Structure formats: structure tokens, C-alpha cells
Design a protein with these regions (language model features):
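Short, low-complexity patches enriched in S/T/P/G
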Residues: 21-33
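A solvent-exposed, acidic/Ser-Thr-rich amphipathic alpha-helical stretch
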Residues: 80-85, 89-133, 138
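Short beta-strand edge/turn micro-motifs at domain boundaries
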Residues: 132, 158-186
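A short, polar/proline- and glycine-enriched secondary-structure boundary/capping micro-motif
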Residues: 145-148, 183-189
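Exposed beta-sheet edge and beta->alpha loop/turn motif
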Residues: 138-169
Length: 195
């Protein structure tokens, strides 16, 4: 680098730019254009990151809404045709219920319908991360059909259940659940107690 190309410390003015009175006016313009280019790139990158974050939040909310709709339509509204559309045809339930398709899952819901009436589901917690949705629900229902050899008692029972769902492209593909079967059975066997 020759002396005419080099920027000397005494050529820089108070604003941090090369003094206009120096021989290096062209270099001053190059710095300004370079800074302008960097600023434009940073703005574009920021906009892209905001859009990606917004899209992730939209997907997370859609996944949460899907899981909520599954419980509301499956247990409360008994809209089984709609529930079929919420799950993949090869839906896989890792819980003891062992549904291996969306049709199996709906058949389980239909079995529950024969045993219980006036079912309400309160979503207590709903946590979403990436393609996973964790739900904690409180069920309240009337025992109106035979369950595990126990004839209908008319009792209202309540219990909490946990369920984790994997959602891909807006469809539930897998689930892992905990249902307190023993607690439910104990409530049904107790005489004249409502829960």
C-alpha cells in the first residue's frame, strides 16, 4: 500500500470519517457505501428472522389449537368425523390403549361415549415445543354405562390426565398418555360419593 492509498490517523475527522480535504476522497465514499450495504444486509436478515419467528409462533398456536379441538370434539362434542381429520391415518398411540390408526382412536372415543355421559374437558396446561404438544386436562363425566364390570352408577367422577402429542404438518401423528385408570375405578367403586 502506498502512502497515497493509506489512511493516516490525522486524516480522520471528529465524526470518525476521513476528512474531505485529504487526498483520499474516494476512500471516504467507499466506506460510506460499504456501511450502507452492511446496514441493508442487517435489515434484511432481521426481517427474515422476524418472519421465521412469527411462522414458528403461528405453527405453535395451530398445534395447540389442534390438540384442544381434538379433546373438545372427541370427548365433549362427539364429532368423530372431525376427529378423524385431526389425526394421520397411521396415527400411533404409545399408551396402553394402543390405537394404531385414526380409526382405532375414534373407536376408543366411541367406547368411552358408551360408558360416560356429560363429559367435559378442561385444559389445565398446554405446552408446545417444536412439533410436540404436552397437555394436562381435567375430565368430569357421569358414569352411565358399564366400566370394567362395574354397572352404571350415575356418579360424577373427575380426574386429571396427561397426554403428549407429536404434530406434523397440522396432523397428530403420535401420542403418549397417562390416564389414571386405577383412580377412576376406585371412584366408581366407592358408595354414594361424588367427585
Amino acid at each position: 500500500m502506498t502512502e497515497t492509498e493509506a489512511v493516516k490517523l490525522n486524516d480522520i475527522n471528529e465524526e470518525g470519517l476521513i476528512d474531505k480535504n485529504t487526498k483520499n476522497k474516494g476512500l471516504n465514499n467507499k466506506i460510506v457505501y460499504s456501511l450502507f450495504g452492511v446496514i441493508i444486509v442487517l435489515i434484511i436478515a432481521g426481517v427474515i428472522l422476524l418472519l421465521l419467528h412469527k411462522n414458528k409462533n403461528d405453527t405453535t398456536q395451530k398445534n395447540a389449537d389442534l390438540v384442544t379441538a381434538f379433546f373438545k370434539d372427541g370427548y365433549e362434542n362427539k364429532n368423530f368425523d372431525k376427529v378423524l381429520t385431526y389425526m394421520a391415518k397411521d396415527y400411533y398411540d404409545h399408551s396402553p390403549a394402543s390405537a394404531r390408526s385414526n380409526v382405532d382412536a375414534v373407536n376408543i372415543l366411541k367406547t368411552v361415549e358408551k360408558m360416560y355421559s356429560n363429559v367435559t374437558v378442561e385444559m389445565l396446561d398446554l405446552t408446545c415445543q417444536n412439533d410436540m404438544v404436552a397437555a394436562r386436562m381435567k375430565f368430569r363425566m357421569v358414569h352411565s354405562g358399564e366400566v370394567s364390570g362395574i354397572p352404571a352408577t350415575g356418579k360424577t367422577i373427575t380426574f386429571e390426565a396427561l397426554e403428549n402429542f407429536k404434530v406434523v404438518n397440522g396432523i397428530i401423528v403420535e401420542s403418549w398418555g397417562y390416564w389414571p385408570d386405577k383412580q377412576i375405578e376406585e371412584q366408581l367403586k366407592k358408595k354414594n360419593e361424588q367427585y
